Amino acid sequence: KGAMGLMQVMPRVARQFGVGGDLTDPANNVLLAIKVLSKIEKSLDFAPGTPSTDRMQIVLACYNAGIGHVLDARSLARKYGANPDSWADVSTYLSRKSDPEVASDSAVKYGRFNSSQTLSFVDNVCAKYQTYCSNFSR
């Protein structure tokens, strides 16, 4: 079964986190998503001083794509002298994972990946976030 509810949580993720109940219930769904996002951020081991915007974008990409593909992109960034904590650099390498040559690089563990949906997801969430912030600050 596919993603469910407001935060589009996969049922298998709910099981992994031991969360039962109705995933279409907004409160249950959002609470589970918060747990998932928090676990993702903690597991990424960002360098001190990593800007919150970069953190947010990288975590959102993990939430959407699965952490493995983003870890690959961060490994590629690190290997080729880019910043694995910069969304600009990580998104560049994430988009390159659709290339079979890049996907076969020794830094890649999770194979090829078409990142277009994930990159759009991150852009859309961040644009909505900016809109909400600007409306709230009025």
Task: State the predicted function of each range.
Residues 1-16, 79:
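Short, surface-exposed glycine/acidic/tryptophan-bearing loops
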